[in-house]
From Swiss-Prot:
Keywords: Cytoplasm, DNA-binding, Transcription, Transcription regulation. NCBIfam families: PRK00110.1 (NF001030), PRK12378.1 (NF009044), YebC/PmpR family DNA-binding transcriptional regulator (TIGR01033). The keyword DNA-binding applies. Coiled coil: none annotated. GO terms for cellular component: cytosol. Belongs to the TACO1 family. The keyword NADP does not apply. This is Probable transcriptional regulatory protein GAU_0635. GO terms for biological process: regulation of DNA-templated transcription. It is found in: Cytoplasm. The lineage of its organism: Bacteria, Pseudomonadati, Gemmatimonadota, Gemmatimonadia, Gemmatimonadales. It comes from Gemmatimonas aurantiaca (strain DSM 14586 / JCM 11422 / NBRC 100505 / T-27).
Length: 247
């Protein structure tokens, strides 16, 4: 039975091999800019910025792009004034959805999100209508191939992780939000290749979806992620592997 973390892995693999690479760069640049705006441009003292830079480097973003994004965040270069917004929603099958965006126009963004929801069997929720179903966590992954689960789990816990879950293709490692970067560095110091370090809304419990609800849900999640302003979508579902693979 596959869950939302596996769906994210599938979407990342597709993004790396098709024309969505430009959209991925845009999201990473906005995250770097936002991190620098909120925590300053010194990556040494700004864990969120360090993580954003690492993620950008992992997909071969040019250094000039990274430097410009930082300077726009700190105000050294003129740029768009972004703000972070968070939306809560329901999808097919009663699935709870958290939608994080970075935007220069919240009015436009909320209208875009509402439109995608209404066109894909979803509904916008009110504040805290679904957020209480999630925990705010740091997450990262390590490819499962060639990795001993027990050794990784021991290394992850020593580095500050709360939990390690094997989703079949990778190990998903969870931490407290403030321990994300330290845990990542601890694992890298043990020669593990850590990918996709990020803050996420992790569901406390999951809802099983199947049949038409599953198909509609995957279509909705993809439609939301295609919005320019949307940075991340988290949801509390699980579904069978065959349906997930056809996503």
């Amino acid at each position: 039975m596959a869950g939302h973390s596996k769906w994210k892995t599938i979407k990342r693999a597709k993004a790396a091999t098709d024309n969505k690479r430009g959209a991925l760069f845009t999201r990473l640049i906005r995250e770097i800019t936002m991190a620098a705006k909120l925590g300053g441009g010194d990556a040494g003292g700004n864990p969120r910025l360090r993580t954003a830079i690492d993620n950008a480097k992992a997909v071969s973003m040019p250094k000039d792009n990274i430097d410009r994004a930082i300077k726009k965040g700190t105000g050294e270069l003129e740029g768009v004034d972004y703000v972070e917004v968070l939306y809560e929603a329901y999808g097919p099958g009663g699935v709870a959805i958290m939608i994080a965006a970075v935007t220069d126009n919240p009015t436009r963004t909320v209208a875009d999100v509402r439109h995608k929801l209404s066109r894909n069997h979803g509904n916008m929720g009110t504040i805290n209508s679904v957020a209480f179903m999630f925990d705010r966590k740091g997450q990262m992954s390590v490819a499962a191939e060639g990795v001993a689960e027990e050794a990784l789990m021991e290394a992850a816990l020593e580095a500050g992780a709360d939990d390690v879950v094997n989703d079949g293709e990778s190990f998903v490692i969870s931490t407290d939000p403030g321990a994300l970067h330290a845990t990542k560095e601890g694992l890298e110091g043990r020669k593990y290749k850590v990918e996709n370090a990020e803050l996420a809304w992790v569901p406390k419990n999951t809802v099983k979806v199947e049949g038409e609800n599953a198909t509609q849900l995957l279509k909705l999640l993809e439609a939301l992620e295609e919005l320019d302003d949307v940075q991340k979508v988290d949801a509390n579902f699980e579904m069978d592997d065959d349906t997930m693979a056809d996503a």
